[in-house]
Swiss-Prot record:
Positions bound to UDP-N-acetyl-alpha-D-glucosamine: T17, A18, G19, N137, R179, S213, Q308
Catalytic activity: di-trans,octa-cis-undecaprenyl diphospho-N-acetyl-alpha-D-muramoyl-L-alanyl-D-glutamyl-meso-2,6-diaminopimeloyl-D-alanyl-D-alanine + UDP-N-acetyl-alpha-D-glucosamine = di-trans,octa-cis-undecaprenyl diphospho-[N-acetyl-alpha-D-glucosaminyl-(1->4)]-N-acetyl-alpha-D-muramoyl-L-alanyl-D-glutamyl-meso-2,6-diaminopimeloyl-D-alanyl-D-alanine + UDP + H(+)
Involved pathway(s): Cell wall biogenesis; peptidoglycan biosynthesis
Name the UniProt record assigns to this protein: UDP-N-acetylglucosamine--N-acetylmuramyl-(pentapeptide) pyrophosphoryl-undecaprenol N-acetylglucosamine transferase
Membrane topology: Peripheral membrane protein
Organism expressing this protein natively: Rhodococcus erythropolis (strain PR4 / NBRC 100887)
GO cellular component: plasma membrane
Record's keyword terms, sorted: Cell cycle, Cell division, Cell membrane, Cell shape, Cell wall biogenesis/degradation, Glycosyltransferase, Membrane, Peptidoglycan synthesis, Transferase
A GO BP entry: peptidoglycan biosynthetic process
Gene symbol of the encoding locus: murG
CDD domains per UniProt: GT28_MurG
Enzyme Commission number(s) of this protein: 2.4.1.227
Keyword Transferase: yes
GO molecular function, one term: UDP-N-acetyl-D-glucosamine:N-acetylmuramoyl-L-alanyl-D-glutamyl-meso-2,6-diaminopimelyl-D-alanyl-D-alanine-diphosphoundecaprenol 4-beta-N-acetylglucosaminlytransferase activity
Compartment(s) of residence: Cell membrane
């Protein structure tokens, strides 16, 4: 781009999974709210969820070749340098075309190429672009660990995530950015509307069950298997079983229904309708559930590097949740542990306060402030450079 710039240009890099995309979009929204004329560009891949999520939020999506970083030595590791070079080359073109003032990276398949295109060694551009990194998980991925060493500011959701800046200092703790509808959430105020929306009774406890965008069979089996015990205790259930799964549950009570749906498009109303939830403990899920002060039973994914359990531990320590392993989540556990929990309003109130104390509702706004400050300084440097030509 040539000539004078009319607005700051912010590039967000966090494609691949919802756990990377949603924080990026939350920050993008906060940036636009603070400075509406800012130009936002999102980097993504053709196979990621960003192909639908980013345009739906009104932002420009630029596709680059993905660079999945293998956790174990495989043939993919041999192909990695070639893939990185191709992706960095394409990313450079995007950064040049939008005249980026700052890159905000959230990890994932597009983050490493963005970091290297901005500052990376022999791959360095004609000018450096400031980098802000945010690590949402309790255990950082490879891309953000590398990028943190190149970044202007390094931010994280929780202490001890493994991302350190160039001075080997730990990241600044800001929490996980959540969308405005969650940050400004009034669970009690929306309760009546939410329950009517889902066909749930206005009175009595409600258990929310969801296993991510695709559902989770272990959660489905355990909770549906305890349907009779839940109904006898007067507990209604709102259960998102996943679009690829089916769930047939006997209705044991007219006053405490079991509402099973493939997918929840209105998670804000689902949170408002519920008194507690059983769910996975991905970083974004924990952030949202904590931000709205919803007591939780977290069931970490049984595979991976254990980061989901780490994500939930601060909430458990604050008294806002309990953790159960995937193989221990059974109908017997639901009947023996979850039913008594939902039947104890004093305990739920205490757990709600504990969860809310851990939640960071202002993270997106705080990160946006940091990003805009860095972008403005870079923009001024570039304007001065143009004026001296």
């Amino acid at each position: 781009m040539s000539g004078n710039k009319s607005a700051l240009s912010v590039v967000v890099a966090g494609g691949g999974t919802a756990g990377h995309i949603e924080p990026a979009l939350a920050v993008a929204d906060a940036v636009k709210a603070a400075q509406p004329d800012t130009r936002i560009t999102a980097l993504g891949t053709a196979r990621g969820l960003e192909t639908t999520l980013v345009p739906a939020r009104g932002y420009t999506l630029e596709l680059i070749p993905p660079v999945p970083l293998p956790r174990k030595p495989t043939m993919d590791l041999v192909k990695l340098p070639t893939r990185i070079l191709a992706s960095v080359r394409k990313t450079r073109e995007v950064l040049d075309s939008v005249d980026a003032d700052v890159i905000v990276g959230f990890g994932g398949y597009v983050a490493l190429p963005a970091y290297l295109a901005a500052r990376g060694g022999v791959l360095r551009r004609r000018r450096k672009i400031p980098i802000v990194i945010h690590e949402a998980n309790a255990s950082a991925g490879i891309a953000n660990k590398i990028g943190a060493r190149l970044a202007t500011r390094v931010l994280a959701a929780v202490p001890g995530s493994g991302v350190k800046n160039r001075g080997d200092q730990d990241a600044e703790i800001v929490g996980i950015p959540v969308r405005a509808s969650i940050a400004n959430f009034d669970r009690a105020g929306l309760r009546s509307q939410a329950r009517e929306y889902f066909g749930l009774p206005q009175d009595g406890p409600v258990l929310l069950v969801f296993g991510g965008s695709q559902g989770a069979k272990s959660l489905n089996d355990a909770v549906s298997g305890a349907a009779e015990e839940l109904a006898k205790a007067g507990i209604s259930v709102l259960h998102a079983h996943g679009p690829k799964n089916s769930l047939e549950v006997t209705q044991y009570s007219e006053t405490a229904p079991y509402v099973a749906v493939p997918y929840l498009s209105r998670m804000d109303l689902a949170y408002a309708a519920a008194d507690a939830t059983i769910c996975r403990s991905g970083a974004m899920t924990v952030a949202e559930v904590s931000a709205v002060g919803l007591p939780a039973v977290y069931v970490p994914l049984p595979h991976g590097n254990g980061e989901q359990e780490l994500n939930a531990k601060p909430v458990v320590a604050a008294g806002g949740a309990i953790i159960v392993s995937d193989n221990e989540l059974t109908p017997t556990f639901v009947a023996g542990t979850v039913v008594p929990m939902l039947s104890d309003s004093a305990r739920l109130d205490k757990m709600s306060s504990g969860a809310a104390n851990v939640g960071h509702r202002t993270a997106a706004t705080e990160i946006a402030r940091i990003v805009l400050d860095i972008a403005a300084k870079e923009n001024a440097v570039q304007e001065n450079a143009r004026g001296n030509r």
